[in-house]
């Protein structure tokens, strides 16, 4: 069924509830519906349609009050957009509802998609959207007591535009009290079978939480009865920052959404921007992008591998693997000039070409790693203690993974071979030979094995990049990407006008909505951009995999021991900046 046929079926099924289809540059349909049909439409798409849309990929809000270019769209003050995916169809659909700007209220789809509540809480936190049957009084990213909803267009975008903050003693006490582990506030039970449960703050400063993040636990002895993750300690307002930066200037910020993913964070953003401008990236630039992205996949997975072993009691592997990472970072630094946050990609290509001798450095790393991985297999994967601590622990199946929006290695460990690089090739991945590693049990052990095998596949991809690196330019010949050559500047004034506009105001993207999706180290990362014909983004929505993966803790953790929770958290491989943005 094509996208057109899907919209036709949806319109026939709900008649007056479908208000129309919005034309975008994306390959999937965007459909506006009446707010009172929200639950019915989502239930139809998830449960009743052939090859259903089982995963809620993302849900977010848009403040439409300052938007100028929205001809043909239903009147809306605040828009709620939900992005659904059908893996069987390899298709997406985006559903939008229009709300009042002053008092936005919507129906919760938590009864249809188990992972909707966190996204709805974020829409309340950032935009003030009230969801029926949703504990919206709990903020999710901002601290208790925060006044206002910062993503509204009436809210300032810089700290210097806000009133001076003064942490008085009384305010400090109030904030401390608000952060207390109150079981009623977190919806935790206090008794089981007549026995009082212990309420425990796990984090936010525990090494086992891998960042500033806490889980409020209800314990019966060492057994976890209920768990409520509490996030937001690392929130920096990345989406708000995008509205104050030009399309070019926001690029370095994308490195820091997942600060271990390096250039991978730049890929979905650039995909969307280049789609908006109709820019065709040269083959050499695409191949370098793939090579560096896979280098960062290896760097991340080595860090995961070592710390996962350490979390389960093995001290030596992490030191060996950090030695390997240092070798890899030397290669990355030699090519990009930086280690973790290169900011190396540009709209339409790269910031510079590969240096002399780059291929020798990369080949040395490729020759070094395979034997090291063989050694680590004996040290970790075949280690009896590691196997005992991870096999059968925190296991879930494919259906549960799709329910909670799990992507990346966490989904593939259940036996489901879904990888954006294969299913929806981008940047030229369709030209590369590699396999998708999968597990079968969906437990901590399989999640580890999948990532180890991904290192081997990344080495295979990088070797193909080195052996088949195209020649040619590293940037597209486009006014938004490259200053014009001197001979062209001397030929006509139009060239100088384009150059002046881009360098003084910043590039201006055509009005519209554009989406980029890539398979980053943790799973599906998606940038949904709205351009209003200005040098800056009107709305930048960043969908990160870690956000969805942490929400699932409340469903997986009950029944396991506290010690098993350490292994489970390590096997998720999340980064708190990726969660909190």
UniProtKB/Swiss-Prot annotation:
GO MF annotation list: NAD binding; NADH dehydrogenase (ubiquinone) activity; NADH:ubiquinone reductase (non-electrogenic) activity; quinone binding
Keyword Acyltransferase: no
Major enzyme class: translocase
Membrane topology term: Peripheral membrane protein
Entry-linked PROSITE patterns: COMPLEX1_49K
Signal peptide residue numbers: none
Segments of this protein annotated with the region NADH dehydrogenase I subunit D: 196-581
Keyword terms: Cell inner membrane, Cell membrane, Membrane, Multifunctional enzyme, NAD, Quinone, Translocase, Transport, Ubiquinone
Keyword 4Fe-4S attached: no
Subcellular localization, as worded in the UniProt entry: Cell inner membrane
Domain of life, source organism: Bacteria
Catalysed conversion reaction: a quinone + NADH + 5 H(+)(in) = a quinol + NAD(+) + 4 H(+)(out)
Location, primary (coarse class): membrane
Record-level GO cellular component terms: NADH dehydrogenase complex; plasma membrane
Enzyme Commission (EC) number: 7.1.1.-
Region (NADH dehydrogenase I subunit C) location: 1-172
Subunit structure as annotated in this protein's UniProt entry: NDH-1 is composed of 13 different subunits. Subunits NuoB, CD, E, F, and G constitute the peripheral sector of the complex.
NCBIfam families found in the cross-reference section: NuoD, PRK06075.1, PRK11742.1
General function of this protein: NDH-1 shuttles electrons from NADH, via FMN and iron-sulfur (Fe-S) centers, to quinones in the respiratory chain. The immediate electron acceptor for the enzyme in this species is believed to be ubiquinone. Couples the redox reaction to proton translocation (for every two electrons transferred, four hydrogen ions are translocated across the cytoplasmic membrane), and thus conserves the redox energy in a proton gradient.
PANTHER family hit by this protein: NADH-QUINONE OXIDOREDUCTASE SUBUNIT C_D, NADH-UBIQUINONE OXIDOREDUCTASE 49 KDA SUBUNIT
Similarity comment text for this entry: In the N-terminal section; belongs to the complex I 30 kDa subunit family. In the C-terminal section; belongs to the complex I 49 kDa subunit family.
Name of the featured protein: NADH-quinone oxidoreductase subunit C/D
Name of the gene: nuoC
């Amino acid at each position: 069924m094509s996208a057109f046929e899907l919209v036709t079926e949806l319109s026939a099924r709900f008649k007056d509830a479908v208000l129309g289809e919005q034309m975008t540059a994306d390959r999937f349909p965007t459909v506006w519906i009446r707010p009172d049909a929200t639950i019915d439409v989502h239930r139809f798409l998830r449960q009743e349609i052939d090859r259903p849309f089982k995963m809620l990929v993302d849900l977010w809000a848009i403040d439409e009050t300052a938007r100028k270019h929205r001809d043909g769209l239903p009147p809306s003050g605040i828009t709620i957009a939900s992005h659904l995916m059908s893996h069987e169809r390899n298709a997406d659909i985006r559903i939008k509802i229009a709300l009042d700007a002053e008092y936005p209220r919507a129906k919760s789809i938590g009864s249809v998609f188990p992972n909707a509540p966190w996204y709805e809480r974020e829409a309340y936190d950032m935009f003030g959207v009230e969801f029926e049957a949703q504990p919206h009084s709990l903020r999710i990213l901002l601290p208790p007591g925060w006044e206002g909803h910062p993503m509204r267009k009436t809210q300032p975008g810089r700290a210097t535009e806000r009133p001076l903050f003064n942490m008085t003693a009384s305010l400090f006490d109030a904030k401390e009290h608000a952060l207390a582990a109150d079981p009623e506030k977190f919806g935790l039970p206090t008794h089981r079978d007549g026995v009082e449960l212990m309420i425990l703050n796990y984090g936010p400063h525990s090494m086992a939480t891998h960042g500033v993040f806490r889980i409020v636990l209800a314990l019966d002895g060492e057994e976890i009865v209920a768990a409520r993750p509490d996030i937001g300690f690392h929130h920096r307002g990345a989406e708000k920052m995008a509205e104050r930066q030009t399309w070019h200037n926001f690029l370095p910020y994308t490195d820091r959404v997942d600060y271990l993913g390096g250039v991978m964070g730049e890929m979905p953003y650039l995909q969307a921007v280049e789609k908006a401008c109709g820019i065709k990236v040269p083959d050499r630039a695409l191949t370098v992008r793939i090579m560096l992205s896979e280098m960062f996949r290896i760097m991340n997975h080595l860090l995961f591998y070592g710390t996962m072993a350490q979390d389960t009691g093995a001290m030596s592997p992490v030191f060996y693997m950090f030695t390997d990472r240092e070798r890899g970072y030397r290669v990355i630094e030699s090519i990009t000039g930086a280690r973790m946050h290169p900011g190396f990609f540009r709209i339409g290509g790269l910031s510079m070409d590969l240096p002399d001798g780059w291929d020798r450095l990369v080949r040395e790393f490729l020759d070094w790693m395979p034997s090291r991985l063989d050694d680590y297999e004996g040290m970790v994967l075949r280690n009896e203690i590691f196997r005992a601590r991870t096999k059968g622990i925190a296991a879930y199946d494919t259906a549960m993974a799709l329910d909670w929006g799990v992507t990346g290695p966490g989904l593939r460990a259940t036996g489901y071979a879904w990888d954006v690089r294969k299913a929806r090739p981008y940047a030229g991945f369709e030209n590369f030979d590699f396999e998708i590693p999968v597990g079968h049990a969906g437990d901590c052990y399989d999640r580890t094995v999948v990532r180890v095998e991904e290192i081997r596949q990344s080495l295979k991809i990088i070797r193909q990049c080195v052996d088949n690196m195209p020649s040619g330019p590293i940037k597209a010949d486009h006014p938004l990407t490259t200053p014009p050559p001197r001979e062209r500047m001397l030929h006509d004034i139009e060239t100088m006008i384009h150059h002046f506009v881009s360098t003084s105001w910043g590039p201006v993207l055509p009005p519209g909505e554009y989406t980029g999706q890539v398979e980053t180290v943790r799973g599906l990362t998606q940038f949904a951009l709205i351009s209003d014909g200005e040098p800056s983004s009107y709305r930048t929505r960043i969908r990160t995999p870690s956000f969805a993966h942490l929400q699932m803790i409340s469903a997986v953790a009950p029944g396991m021991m506290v010690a098993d929770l350490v292994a489970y958290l390590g096997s998720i491989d999340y980064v708190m900046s990726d969660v909190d943005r």
